[in-house]
Curated annotation (Swiss-Prot):
UniProt record similarity statement: Belongs to the asfivirus MGF 505 family.
Function: Plays a role in virus cell tropism, and may be required for efficient virus replication in macrophages.
Induction details: Expressed in the early phase of the viral replicative cycle.
Protein's name in the database: Protein MGF 505-9R
Organism: African swine fever virus (strain Badajoz 1971 Vero-adapted)
UniProt cross-references to InterPro entries, sorted A to Z: MGF_505
Key words of the record: Early protein
Highest taxon, organism lineage: Viruses
Length: 506
């Protein structure tokens, strides 16, 4: 319970002159050695009608003098007990501390308010159960470097604690203490600073890590080169441009950076270095971009650096495109407003040669490729499976399919390819009922293209039709065979004519 006097003192904001010196002293509003006291709002006091102090500063001074009554007054005026404890520690007023100790709670809460390392240490000692490790940890939080300078030798040999404090200082970005620990104590895992710097994206911390690292090894050291390479890979992977530049100050290869930048589409990094590297490296980067399935903007940046000239490595490019099934660069070269570069046919040829049906169909849709082109390529490359599947999908009607296959044979020069298409036609007709005109046309077609076996098969099938018309067809085929010197076709046609003459009544 507050006394009446305390209630008056707590809420008195009036001028003190009318009260007289005796009343002021009886109210406890006189501070020995300083003068009368008057409350000014909630945060300040007026001392001796002249000096204005913050309530926290005032209670700290009063506590350092051991003036318990004035401390009590300032607590009524919303002064902080924490500053009272700090003041008592400064004046070594342990009786005052003892009185308020139970109200303090955790002494560690006072530590951030203390600037003097000696007072800082005294405050920490109030909790008798705390260890040196606790003192060091709070010193890191509050940037109290003198604590380390005073007791740092006690950490020598305690590798675990040194590592723990070092990493804590890195996480809290306390650069002064990091330097002191790094240069004065043996840190087992000095590289931990880099991992934390990457997470925090703290370039200052990152640079400090190299400063510490170079205190242990030279830039020619194999381990140092390995570390630099790892850092460059990670920084470029994450797009940390400033970190990349910082690492390159100490060594490392720009190529390491560029390949990661391409893979993860970090164009800012790529644009910075792309015009400083040889063309051969750019070509490798373009191939890597295909492998990594890079973005359109990344490809354009790379291609523009070589003026879109891909001729010197077009074979490697096509091989990589087909191998990784990523056609974006083919599309970009085709979309150029001027000087379009058409690699569609070249890529299609490799796809037909090495890829599956599904992959080829996807390419056909993407580049609007006619099925005839694909079927003819498949025929030249002896891909029987593709001929059948693509022609079946393109022309569901069998007669329509035969018509298109015949047109392809007519426009092809590749002998084996033509034969393959004609055998495909023959396989279709084996399951199709042809009328007389269709059967005769197909027979003549085989004669024109010197398909001996197929011609013989069709001749056997045509005997069911009108013999007179069939004989006329055979004479026509014989004329074609003689004109082109197709000996076997001529012999077959002649034999069939003789047989018809033999069985036909005269």
């Amino acid at each position: 319970m507050f006394s009446l006097q305390d209630l008056c003192r707590k809420n008195l904001f009036l001028p003190l002159e009318p009260l007289g010196k005796h009343v002021v002293q009886r109210l406890g509003l006189y501070w020995e050695g300083h003068g009368s006291l008057k409350r000014v709002g909630d945060c300040f006091i007026c001392v001796d009608k002249i000096w204005i102090l913050s309530i926290h500063k005032a209670i700290q001074i009063a506590a350092s003098e051991g003036n318990e009554n004035i401390v009590k007054l300032f607590l009524l005026w919303k002064g902080s007990l924490q500053y009272a404890i700090i003041g008592a520690l400064e004046g070594r007023q342990y009786d005052l501390i003892q009185k308020y100790y139970n109200q303090i709670g955790d002494c560690h809460e006072n530590l951030p308010l203390i600037q003097d390392p000696e007072i800082y240490e005294r405050c920490h000692e109030l909790n008798v159960t705390c260890t040196f490790q606790c003192l060091f940890q709070h010193a890191i939080r509050d940037n109290m470097l003198p604590i380390f300078q005073k007791y740092g030798e006690d950490l020598n040999g305690n590798r675990r604690m040194v590592q723990l404090l070092y990493e804590m200082a890195c996480r809290l970005q306390n650069y002064d203490i990091i330097k002191w620990i790094g240069f004065n104590l043996h840190v087992y895992n000095l590289e931990a600073i880099f991992s934390i710097a990457f997470v925090r994206k703290d370039l200052t911390l990152y640079s400090l890590g190299y400063m510490l690292l170079l205190g242990r090894m030279s830039t020619e050291d194999r381990n140092f080169i390995s570390i630099i390479t790892r850092h460059l890979e990670y920084a470029s992977k994450k797009g940390l441009f400033d970190f990349v530049l910082e690492s390159l100050k100490y060594g490392g290869q720009v190529d390491t950076v560029l390949f990661q930048a391409v893979k993860y589409n970090h164009r800012k990094i790529l644009a910075h270095f792309i015009h400083e590297i040889p063309r051969e490296t750019v070509e490798k980067l373009i191939l890597h971009a295909v492998e990594s399935r890079a973005s359109r903007k990344t490809f354009n940046l790379l291609l523009s650096s070589i003026n879109y000239c891909v001729n010197p490595f077009v074979k490697k490019l096509l091989h990589t495109v087909v191998k990784h099934k990523y056609m974006l660069i083919i599309k970009l070269l085709l979309e150029r407003p001027k000087k379009k570069i058409n690699l569609v046919d070249a890529a299609l040829f490799k796809l037909v040669k090495y890829s599956t049906y599904a992959e080829i169909v996807k390419f056909m849709k993407e580049f609007s490729v006619d099925p005839e082109r694909v079927v003819k390529m498949a025929a030249r490359l002896m891909r029987v499976d593709l001929i059948k599947k693509i022609s079946n999908d393109a022309w569901e009607n069998k007669l329509e399919r035969i018509k298109h296959l015949k047109q392809m044979v007519n426009t092809m020069n590749h002998r084996n390819g033509k034969n393959l298409l004609m055998y495909n036609i023959h396989n279709i007709t084996g399951y199709t009922c042809l009328n007389t005109k269709e059967a005769f046309n197909l027979t003549r077609f085989y004669a024109v293209h010197n398909a001996t076996c197929l011609f013989k098969e069709m001749c056997k099938s045509c005997f069911v039709h009108d013999k007179i018309q069939f004989r006329e067809l055979l004479e026509d085929c014989l004329h074609i065979a003689n004109r082109h010197d197709y000996i076997q076709i001529a012999e077959t046609a002649d034999e069939c004519i003789k047989y018809i003459d033999l069985i036909t009544p005269k």
